[in-house]
């Protein structure tokens, strides 16, 4: 029998756990993608090695369709794998995970389609590929080049599986709501009402005045927390601001020019938080990094600090 939705998650957790990844839990806030989890966005910064895997519920208010579209949702799941430094055999590891899920690679058409990734609101970009399985995109591969405007060294490899799409292919269904979550329970049973009601909230009932005030409040608090050298709480305020922006965008409450300005404000915050986090790890001496890597980065930071002081 084809694997259930939860079987797929358990198989991926087991596979990556056996390959040295820390199996983490989802970030407990509204985020638009697994990349926004601190285990990816912040851990990609600096010289400290990191291997983690986790499921991340992802919210994109604008994509809601009141539960009427068979493959478009405002809330869905990603399975995220982060490998730093990116291993030379990352593609082979990924293909191994497909085999673990039950794909026969000799009988299925797996294609890597070049697709460099960018997230303007996080000031992040990377070189990468979409993975197409028999004509359907199921995974995004990225080698991070920058996060929060800061160069990534060593390079972090990110693998993002679209769990619903993988499951639809494995189970041979045309609608996400027909997926078997587990025996006797469908995706419709678990999430259809949520899609209907959250779509109504996102498009009709969110309070625009409140959201506009909330965005500015989160922005201000993030800035205050960075002054206090509290990078992680500051980052949470950035995530709150980003989700608030997404709700405003879904509501049609901001114009095209305002939209660009809001994205710029979030990007500036993300850049500041990235630097604040890197500084906080530097103050600790990058304790998880090989000594030579840590010393090199600390020396570069010291050099930049002296250069700024001389220019002042």
From Swiss-Prot:
Protein name: Glycine--tRNA ligase alpha subunit
NCBIfam families: glyQ, PRK09348.1
A molecular function GO annotation: ATP binding
Top-level lineage group: Bacteria
Record text on subunit structure and interactions: Tetramer of two alpha and two beta subunits.
Broad enzyme group: ligase
Compartments, as annotated in UniProt: Cytoplasm
CDD domains in alphabetical order: GlyRS_alpha_core
Family: Belongs to the class-II aminoacyl-tRNA synthetase family.
Gene Ontology biological process terms in this record: glycyl-tRNA aminoacylation
Keyword tags: Aminoacyl-tRNA synthetase, ATP-binding, Cytoplasm, Ligase, Nucleotide-binding, Protein biosynthesis
CC terms in the record's Gene Ontology section: cytosol
UniProt cross-references to Pfam families, sorted A to Z: tRNA-synt_2e
Record-linked InterPro entries: aa-tRNA-synth_II/BPL/LPL, Gly-tRNA-synth_heterodimer, Gly-tRNA_ligase_asu
Organism field: Thiobacillus denitrificans (strain ATCC 25259 / T1)
Lineage: Bacteria, Pseudomonadati, Pseudomonadota, Betaproteobacteria, Nitrosomonadales
Chief place of localization: cytoplasm
Enzyme Commission (EC) number: 6.1.1.14
Gene that encodes the chain: glyQ
Keyword tRNA processing: no
Catalytic activity: tRNA(Gly) + glycine + ATP = glycyl-tRNA(Gly) + AMP + diphosphate
């Amino acid at each position: 029998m084809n694997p259930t939705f939860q079987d797929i998650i358990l198989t991926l957790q087991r596979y990556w756990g056996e390959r040295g990844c820390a199996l983490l839990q989802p970030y407990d806030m509204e985020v638009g993608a697994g990349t926004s989890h601190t285990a990816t966005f912040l851990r990609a910064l600096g010289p400290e090695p990191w291997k983690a895997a986790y499921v991340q519920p992802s919210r994109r208010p604008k994509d809601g369709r009141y539960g009427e579209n068979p493959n478009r949702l405002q809330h869905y799941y990603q399975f995220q794998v982060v490998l730093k430094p990116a291993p030379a055999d990352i593609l082979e590891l990924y293909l191994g995970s497909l085999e673990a899920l039950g794909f026969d690679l000799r009988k299925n058409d797996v294609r890597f389609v070049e697709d460099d990734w960018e997230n303007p609101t996080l000031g992040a970009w990377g070189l990468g590929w979409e993975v197409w399985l028999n004509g359907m995109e199921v995974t995004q591969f990225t080698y991070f080049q920058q996060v929060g405007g800061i160069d990534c060294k060593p390079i972090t490899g990110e693998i993002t599986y679209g769990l619903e799409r993988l499951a639809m292919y494995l189970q041979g269904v045309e609608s996400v709501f027909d997926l078997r979550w587990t025996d006797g329970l469908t995706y419709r049973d678990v999430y259809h009402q949520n899609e209907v009601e959250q779509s109504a909230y996102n498009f009709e009932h969110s309070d625009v005045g409140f959201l506009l005030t909330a965005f500015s409040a989160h922005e201000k608090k993030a800035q205050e927390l960075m002054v206090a050298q509290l990078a992680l709480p500051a980052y949470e305020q950035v995530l709150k601001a980003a989700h608030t922006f997404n709700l405003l965008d879904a509501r049609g409450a901001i114009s095209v020019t305002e939209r660009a300005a809001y994205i710029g404000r979030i990007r500036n915050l993300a850049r500041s938080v990235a630097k604040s986090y890197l500084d906080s790890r530097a103050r600790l001496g990058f304790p998880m990094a090989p000594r030579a890597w840590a010393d090199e980065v600390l020396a570069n930071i010291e050099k930049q600090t002296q250069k700024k002081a001389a220019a002042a």
